[in-house]
């Protein structure tokens, strides 16, 4: 029998226990696959549980000192506040599993064309530190592994979370084989921006028309210029007008059209693509889940994937 065309990395540990008043919407990691299964977009057997990412893979991107600080739960209170989560063995295991999920997706995408991690997109993690709810930079770890194993020669990271992928930009600032492209809120976190290979800062209140026009223009130019043979796509939904921190005016339909542009481009040029969910902080969890589910639905339609 042919292999299933739809590959999704997911583990129940993605939903990590947090204090009740914590602002991170951890529940979404449980609700996204539940909704997609309930509506028939996917089935249980398309969810693949990653193992924990080994030190060997992490150390291709992160420093040994940082990794051992995490293993020994030896970050200061200030460093933990910058990350936004209290360190624990359970949390570090979760982050390893999410990172391995993106690695598994990368190898699946080489075969299937596209693969999804229900979590991931931890683009604020630097080689030697974490911040902004990010501990290991899963895209960077997976990209470095693909390069090391000669599975890709030229990688394009498309970061459409509303916050700049500062950790990713810094990690790859001297790496010619990885091109970092970020469209993000100009006046949003992180307030000190790193230099991506291409940054498109967006004014507060940017609407669908402006956003989608910019994305179409720059993405096509990048495909021609960079000639990527692999894409990592961070499909954050914190660009929505409902988001508590986004500051943009992107509608739900505009968010769908954004995904369509990326997926149609990757599909048309037959470039393997890994998708990770990134951020989303709308007040209603249903809005966040619907926007993330739309990303799956859009890809399923464009790639003609079936459950």
Segment roles from a protein language model:
Residues 4, 77-307:
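A general "terminal functional-core" signal
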Residues 51-75:
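Charged, often glycine-rich, active-site loop that binds/positions anionic groups
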Residues 13-18, 52-56, 78-91:
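Glycine-/proline-rich flexible loop or hinge segments
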Residues 41, 74-79:
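ATP-dependent kinase catalytic cores of phosphoinositide-metabolizing enzymes
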Residues 44-55, 274-283:
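Acidic carboxylate-rich catalytic motifs and surrounding loops in phosphoryl-/glycosyl-chemistry enzymes
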Residues 1-53:
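N-terminal low-complexity, Ser/Thr- and acidic-residue-enriched intrinsically disordered segments
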């Amino acid at each position: 029998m042919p292999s299933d065309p739809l590959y999704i990395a997911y583990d129940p540990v993605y939903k990590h226990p947090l204090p009740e008043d914590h602002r991170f919407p951890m529940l979404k990691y449980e609700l996204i696959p539940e909704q997609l299964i309930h509506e028939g977009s996917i089935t249980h057997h398309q969810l693949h549980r990653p193992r924990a990412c080994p030190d060997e893979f992490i150390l291709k991107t992160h420093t040994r000192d940082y990794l051992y600080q995490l293993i020994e739960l030896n970050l200061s209170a200030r460093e933990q506040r910058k990350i936004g989560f209290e360190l624990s063995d359970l949390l570090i295991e979760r982050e390893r599993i999410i990172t391995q999920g993106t690695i598994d997706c990368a190898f699946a995408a080489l075969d299937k064309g596209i693969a999804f991690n229900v979590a991931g997109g931890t683009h604020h993690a630097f080689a030697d530190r974490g911040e902004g709810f990010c501990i290991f930079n899963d895209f960077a770890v997976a990209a470095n592994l693909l390069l090391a194993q000669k599975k890709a020669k030229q990688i394009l990271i498309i970061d459409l979370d509303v916050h700049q992928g500062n950790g990713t930009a810094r990690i790859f600032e001297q790496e010619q084989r990885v091109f970092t492209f970020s469209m993000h809120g100009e006046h949003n976190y992180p307030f000190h921006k790193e230099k991506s290979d291409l940054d498109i800062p967006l004014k507060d209140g940017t609407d669908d028309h402006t956003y989608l026009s910019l994305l179409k223009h720059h993405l096509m130019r990048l495909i021609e210029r960079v000639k990527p043979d692999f894409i990592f796509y961070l499909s954050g939904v914190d660009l929505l007008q409902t988001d508590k921190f986004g500051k943009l005016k992107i509608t739900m339909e505009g968010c769908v059209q954004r995904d369509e542009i990326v997926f149609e481009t990757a599909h048309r040029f037959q470039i393997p693509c890994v998708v990770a969910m990134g951020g989303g902080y709308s007040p209603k969890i249903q809005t966040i889940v619907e926007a993330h589910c739309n990303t799956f639905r859009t890809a399923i339609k464009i790639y003609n994937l079936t459950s």
